[in-house]
């Protein structure tokens, strides 16, 4: 039986964002990837004098998926789409609080892609919070990270790359007679990224398409 969730819980979300070192290379689902062929996106926090992964607290009524995408954009300027979920980190804070951080694999949305038009503008984090960002190799990132939990997440990304599990796709399963909204049908968007508007009353299908890919059974005939 899982341990009970702490009463004083601070929920946060973030992503380990990666890209190929070769900008012309296209990611294919199930393709094994040499970790030397990718870079990961890190942020420097002057308050703690450390390098870490972009993340932050959820806002009122915000889903974890939307928070992860928003926080990455606030801290790095990158608009991303989320892939597979990673290990959730949990640790104690002062005052009897427990922090729970949910992470996903993230990839940058191509510049000028239609999904950018679905998002509200996001203000960048102040330099007192994040003063540097860096794309770096997984090998160098392992030396830069200071927290063991962050290094475990990096190890997961590296393992997924080697095993062909880094690139995933989203599968929408509709009940018989259920159709996509015109917004999604017309866009044909495979890079939809979650946004506060999508998570708080926007198109349900758009929000679903932005969520991490999960295996689902195929629909059965009615």
Per-region residue spans from a language model:
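Generic beta-strand structural signal
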Residues: 13, 102, 131-132, 167-170
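A generic fold-level signal
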Residues: 8-10, 35, 96-99, 128, ...
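N-terminal strand-loop-strand
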Residues: 2-53, 170-184
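Charged phosphate-binding loop/patch that engages nucleotide di/tri-phosphates or the phosphate backbone
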Residues: 150-168
């Amino acid at each position: 039986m899982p341990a009970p969730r702490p009463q004083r819980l601070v929920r946060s979300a973030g992503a380990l964002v990666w890209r190929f070192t070769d900008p012309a290379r296209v990611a294919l689902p199930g393709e094994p990837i040499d970790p030397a062929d990718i870079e990961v996106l890190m942020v420097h926090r002057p308050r703690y004098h450390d390098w870490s992964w972009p993340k932050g607290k959820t806002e009122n009524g915000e889903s974890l998926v939307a928070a992860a995408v928003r926080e990455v954009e606030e801290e790095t300027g990158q608009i991303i789409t989320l892939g597979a979920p990673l290990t959730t980190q949990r640790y104690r804070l002062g005052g009897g609080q427990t922090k729970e951080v949910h992470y996903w694999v993230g990839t940058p949305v191509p510049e000028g892609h239609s999904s950018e038009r679905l998002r509200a503008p996001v203000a960048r984090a102040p330099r007192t919070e994040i003063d540097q960002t860096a794309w770096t190799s997984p090998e160098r990132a392992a030396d830069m990270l200071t927290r063991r939990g962050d290094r475990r997440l990096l190890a997961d990304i590296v393992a997924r790359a080697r095993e062909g599990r880094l690139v995933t796709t989203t599968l929408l399963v509709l009940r018989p007679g259920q159709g996509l909204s015109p917004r999604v049908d017309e866009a044909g968007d495979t890079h939809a990224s979650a946004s506060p508007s999508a998570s708080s009353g926007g198109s349900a299908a758009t929000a679903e398409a932005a969520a991490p890919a999960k295996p689902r059974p195929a629909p059965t005939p009615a």
